[in-house]
Design a protein with these regions (language model features):
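Conserved substrate/cofactor phosphate-moiety recognition/catalytic segment
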Residues: 18-61
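Conserved glycine(s) of the Walker
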Residues: 12
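Conserved Walker
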Residues: 15
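NTP-dependent small-molecule kinase module
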Residues: 143-168
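A glycine- and Lys/Arg-enriched "phosphate-lid" helix/loop adjacent to the NTP-binding pocket
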Residues: 98-144, 148
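Glycine-rich phosphate-binding loop used to anchor ATP phosphates in small-molecule kinases
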Residues: 53-106
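P-loop (Walker A) phosphate-binding loop of NTP-binding proteins
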Residues: 8
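Hydrophobic anchor at the beta1->P-loop junction of P-loop NTPases
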Residues: 5
Length: 168
């Protein structure tokens, strides 16, 4: 079984992956860690700001890791924002039967009413080296992700209330 966890920044992808790892004992592949390893090692000239270019670049690698895990009968959790919404097109029906996908999406109302939680929990699993959280940008990104999930018929988990408090 391969579990894919996608979503915008600050939605809790890494936290969910951590909790699933603890529950099921599946290893976790963080696409962000892969990205930074490739960038810092000089394997790519892309930078962390090259989001539009990073998705196809990283997905080509992650896709083949997923296929290898399935072929080897290994379980794996993959988390990150670099999973394209048309990801299902890259797998045959046998592979798709062994993949679970969820996109974490915070509603506009949640982000407006709980922006303090978003900031407070941003380092609950990992230490971030990011600038200030832009709630308007997060709202825009989450709304775009919801529309894409609906367009592609993908499963999403809407975060609409104080669900994040469980991170404490």
């Amino acid at each position: 079984m391969v579990i894919l966890i996608s979503g915008a920044s600050h939605t809790g992808k890494t936290l969910l992956a951590q909790k699933l790892m603890e529950q099921y004992r599946y290893p976790v592949l963080s696409i962000d860690l892969l990205k930074m390893g490739l960038i810092r090692s000089g394997q790519t000239e892309l930078t962390p700001e090259d989001d539009n270019l990073l998705t196809p670049y990283l997905w080509g690698i992650v896709r083949e890791i997923i296929k290898t895990a399935i072929e080897n009968g290994q379980s794996l959790i993959v988390e990150g924002c670099y999973i394209p919404f048309d990801w299902e097109d890259d797998f045959d029906s046998d592979c798709l039967e062994q993949i679970e996908y969820v996109c974490l999406i915070m509603t506009k109302k949640y982000l407006e009413n709980h922006s303090d939680d978003v900031v407070r929990f941003e380092n609950v699993v990992e230490r971030r080296l990011l600038d200030e959280v832009n709630i308007d940008k997060l709202i825009e990104e989450n709304e775009r992700n919801l529309a894409s999930c609906q367009q592609y018929g993908l499963r999403c988990r809407l975060i609409a209330n104080r669900l994040r408090a469980e991170a404490q």
